[in-house]
């Protein structure tokens, strides 16, 4: 994973841990304010799980994750159980803990269609479709900096990792992490009904 650390103006034992969405960098959330008295660790690029960061100073962790970041956060805390008790709140945005699933994630047919469209020849059209119009021009320019291969590898990784694994509901790796989930009514990637299905069962 890639990381960006922004310390508070004074030393603190509270951390906002933010898992970004697929393909995105810190520019996607740089306009948001950070609560006073809290450090921020922003993570993105989930082609690997590797993370070099010292969590020992923090007594409280406020977890926030966007889309694929929810899957990445579940995976991270499953490998770092010692941190789970420090999570005081968890906010999930526009996604679920199972990245590819016909009932509670991205429908598999849509997932494969997206992969097929993610080619060097189709890259500009793909980026514009994914990021919308001029309102998100700054995101478009930032995403263009990443190679097509990198985006492809990041997008396919959850499917590759989870393909032959059981997907129980509720998801054990997510227990105790999430206190709120926000679902976009017009989400074109993870259908709102699938998100509702997941969070209704996950609780």
List PLM regions with ranges.
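Active-site catalytic motif of lipid deacylating hydrolases and related acyltransferases
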Residues: 1-59, 110-111
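The conserved beta1-alpha1 loop
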Residues: 17-21, 66, 183-184
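Short alpha-helix in the alpha/beta-hydrolase fold that links the catalytic acid
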Residues: 30-31, 177, 191-200
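Gly/Ala-rich beta-loop-alpha elbow adjacent to hydrolase catalytic centers
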Residues: 64-73
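Flexible "cap/lid" loop of the alpha/beta hydrolase fold
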Residues: 82-117, 154-163
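Helix-rich cap/lid subdomain of alpha/beta-hydrolase
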Residues: 99-142
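Hydrophobic, aromatic-rich cap/lid helix
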Residues: 140-169
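Short beta-strand/loop motif that positions the catalytic acidic residue
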Residues: 175, 181-183, 187
